[in-house]
Amino acid sequence: MTAHEVNFDGLVGLTHHYAGLSFGNEASTRHRFQMSNPRLAVKQGLLKMKALADAGFPQAVIPPHERPFIPALRQLGFTGSDEQILDKVARQAPRWLSSVSSASPMWVANAATVCPSADALDGKVHLTVANLNNKFHRALEVPVTEALLRAIFRDESQFSVHSALPQVALLGDEGAANHNRLGGEYGSAGVQLFVYGREEENEIRPARYPARQSREASEAVARLNQVNPQQVIFAQQNPEVIDQGVFHNDVIAVSNRQVLFCHEAAFARQKVLINQLRTRVDGFMAIEVPAGEVSVSDAVATYLFNSQLLSRDDGSMLLVLPRECQDHAGVWRYLNKLVAEDNPISAMQVFDLRESMANGGGPACLRLRVVLTEEERRAVNPAVMMNDALFTALNAWADRYYRDRLTAADLADPLLLREGREALDVLTRLLDLGSVYPFQQTGAADG
């Protein structure tokens, strides 16, 4: 059956700021406390979405979350009105205020793991929400992510959205950022590659930074998503590269159809994995980048592998890259050589995503890939699909509500909370989502 990959990109939230919340993510740590520009950030993301949609790649949006998230502060023991709580936490525990104000939901590669209908035992599209339990600010995302996905993929005859795994360390799950799908045509059965950093009875794990994804979680997600057991491979990420800042597999590898583009040091038993894939995937091609041409540290600094690999109508592939790759002489030299060689990657497109990149999120972090047949695509909430009208509306919305500068001190401003809630109220109507946010369900917008 004919199917296409649709990229659902996360909209950057109104409280996008640099707090260094993500240990193991070196860009996040390096840019801590710098001033951010939320309006520029959301527009950089919108420009990427629109450019790719105009080039013929189906594109949709996933909204941001309510931030600052007052219910989480109430759970932590802060009391009073919303304004009183903001004042208390800013004075007593500013780190918590930063955590509950994180715009990290924009990196929707961590929202869920997706199984196309061609791979599922029941013939449905499955999405399992990631629990993101390695980081407090990310674990907060889970309930609203589930509500948003149910509002977008609302036809239960076509889609099954599964709740996240239990919030325990053993079942740490980071979603599609640790998942690749390889195969031929999108509508044909493929091989799903689940990548983990640790497993309970395996002492091979990183020493410096945490391995966020467990094998136990990957296996559970594969079961929930009803992936045909004959179409699954579980592989361990190289713990040495996790210790160099590769906190998700999509920082060191990206796949599309029959191609796996990765660093030569990406996986723990890479030769074995490559041979497995060669056996299981017709026409499989591994493009392994040697350390002599691009070091792991340069790959992390430029997010070379946090790129999007997209299929064009002529069968060739487009590599969507952050500007940091172009700015790095060695990486750019390698890429120009790559597209000149005999392989499916024949073109590159560079985007300025520096607001997101400074927090450790490149093009691939910002999107959730969902393979859909034409019938399934018609069943998706049509209001989230990118087109000229939505692009214009979202830019006007951003101009109205987003600030052009934000520091950690601004997070305590009650006006920011009110601006955010008003903006999300408008957005849910624009995207026909219903009342997906807690403040809409409880009347908290009134104070």
Curated annotation (Swiss-Prot):
Gene Ontology MF term list: N-succinylarginine dihydrolase activity
Its biological purpose: Catalyzes the hydrolysis of N(2)-succinylarginine into N(2)-succinylornithine, ammonia and CO(2).
Family: Belongs to the succinylarginine dihydrolase family.
Domain of life, per lineage: Bacteria
Gene name, Swiss-Prot/TrEMBL: astB
Protein name: N-succinylarginine dihydrolase
Pathway: Amino-acid degradation; L-arginine degradation via AST pathway; L-glutamate and succinate from L-arginine: step 2/5
GO annotation terms (biological process): arginine catabolic process to glutamate; arginine catabolic process to succinate
Signal peptide: none
Keywords: Arginine metabolism, Hydrolase
Organism: Salmonella paratyphi B (strain ATCC BAA-1250 / SPB7)
Amino-acid positions noted as binding substrate in the UniProt annotation, renumbered to this chain: 19-28, 110, 137-138, 212, 250, 359
Cystine pairs: none
Assembly information from the UniProt record: Homodimer.
EC number: 3.5.3.23
Gene3D superfamilies named among the record's database cross-references: Succinylarginine dihydrolase (3.75.10.20)
